[in-house]
């Protein structure tokens, strides 16, 4: 049969082409029944496949090249208390901040000029990572990474001891110069 005669038969709707195809004897119901009742291994494989987590890294795919940020975890946050004796220990403070640890820095063991230099250094590092800093006490500072929110909830409550002196405190605060730094002596300047 030529190609042209086949095309004519298709256009004319001739049933002659139906006999060209070989019929395969295939009973699909037998396979379905075998799968449902006798093939326990197949059903457990299907159950395993359907219950598998597609996002699980151990499912036959090579590990990802994504590197997580240091210090981010679902574990509790860590607070480090550091009492440096020299400026040489300040890079450890910056490293702790980079690892997203909150640092309480006690500078009472340092010389006043070294303590000022240390605070400036750590404050610059904290600023670079968008962190927060708070002065907690005399020569004691709190430095926190950006993932930690620092709030100052200390507000003086009214009590009988501070109610009587409240007016006098306001007057003395208005006339007093800037507060003294936490370290060293200050030289009084004439206004």
Swiss-Prot record:
Q: Which InterPro entries match?
A: Cell_div_SepF, Cell_div_SepF/SepF-rel, SepF-like_sf
Residues of the region (Disordered) are 156-191
The biological processes this protein is annotated with in GO are: division septum assembly; FtsZ-dependent cytokinesis
Q: Where in the cell is it found?
A: Cytoplasm
- Major subcellular site: cytoplasm
One GO cellular-component annotation of the UniProt record comes to:
cytoplasm
Alphabetized UniProt keyword annotations: Cell cycle, Cell division, Cytoplasm, Septation
The keyword rRNA processing is annotated on this UniProt entry: no
Tell me which domain of life the UniProt entry assigns to the organism this sequence originates from.
Answer: Bacteria
Keyword Transport carried by entry = no
> Which residues lie in Polar residues bias regions?
156-167
Query: Record's family?
Result: Belongs to the SepF family.
Its assembly, as annotated, is:
Homodimer. Interacts with FtsZ.
Q: Which PANTHER family match?
A: CELL DIVISION PROTEIN SEPF
The protein's name in its UniProt record = Cell division protein SepF
Q: Which organism is it from?
A: Prochlorococcus marinus (strain NATL1A)
């Amino acid at each position: 049969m030529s190609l042209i005669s086949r095309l004519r038969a298709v256009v004319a709707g001739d049933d002659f082409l139906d006999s060209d195809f070989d019929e395969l004897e295939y009973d699909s119901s037998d396979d379905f029944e075998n799968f449902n009742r006798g093939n326990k291994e197949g059903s457990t494989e299907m159950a395993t496949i359907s219950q598998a987590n597609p996002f699980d890294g151990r499912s036959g795919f090579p590990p990802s090249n994504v590197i997580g940020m240091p210090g981010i975890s679902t574990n509790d946050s860590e607070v480090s208390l550091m009492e440096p004796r020299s400026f040489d220990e300040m890079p450890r403070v910056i490293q702790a901040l980079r690892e997203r640890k909150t640092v309480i820095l006690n500078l009472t063991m340092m010389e006043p000029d070294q303590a000022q230099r240390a605070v400036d250094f750590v404050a610059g590092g904290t600023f670079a990572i968008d962190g927060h800093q708070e002065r907690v006490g005399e020569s004691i500072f709190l430095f926190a990474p950006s993932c930690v929110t620092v709030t100052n909830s200390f507000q003086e409550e009214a009590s009988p001891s501070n109610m009587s002196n409240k007016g006098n405190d306001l007057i003395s605060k208005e006339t007093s110069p800037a507060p003294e730094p936490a370290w060293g002596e200050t030289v009084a300047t004439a206004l």
